[in-house]
Amino acid sequence: MPDQNDQVAVEWGPYQIVQSTGARPYAKYMSNGKDKIYFAYTTGHPDNENPNFLYFNYIDIHSLQLKDVKGNTLSTIADGTFKVNKTDDYARQYPSTLIDNPSARDWVWQVASDENDNPVIAMVRISSDKNSHDYYYAKWNGHEWKKTFLANAGGHFHQTPNSEKCYSAGMTIDPANTNHVYCSLPVEGKQGKVYEIVKFILNEVGEVVSTEAVTQDSQQNNVRPYIVPNSKIRLCGSHGCMAIITIGLSVHGIRKAIAQGLPVILKVSRGRRRKRLL
């Protein structure tokens, strides 16, 4: 936009906003639709990072500055990246950038905001051995992150035993009512232990007040719930079993999984010879 003197300044991008010491950080983003872009992100992929911290920042779109949850300026985006890590020194210097600095592995699922523009986070704490996944609801109350344990989600949800052990069955916050959270949990029912969708209702201070079974006694898993914004179809997800196969390692495994009716996630393996499947 031209300034008061009808002059236009052009700045070229894109800019790298944050740089982590970890490998393959994961991030989730959302906008309040007015003046802020919220995002939460990890040190790296939980497979590679133990511990794996979870951070929160927002972009002020008027000043184009990166800020922490209290509004403190961390950097001007055009001037360079803000560097994060998982040391004690970093935690002491930038405490308001941290949602969680656990002793194990965090992963982020969603960023939302309540009616007062306070950020709300869906997150998972994964044990060091990756065999236990705990769902948490984290909400900024103006002073601190209130982290509420929702449920244990077992381990990885898919049917491949020794691959992608940090893949949880999934959770999602309703952006229209951030006190409602939907989680996929292993539940014992008529068909044995199957992943079902459970709704958690929390109060304004982040305490669970009730739960409700959305699916029950299913024959196959219900995983990866997701709220469709601005739609009459509010909640969707995946149904059935799933296998993860690395391309180039097991064409036979792919054919076997397909023959069993399993949806297959094809994971490309770098540096390995790939075989043509069809």
Feature locations, PLM:
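Extracellular, repeat-based ectodomains that mediate carbohydrate processing or recognition
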Residues: 1-278
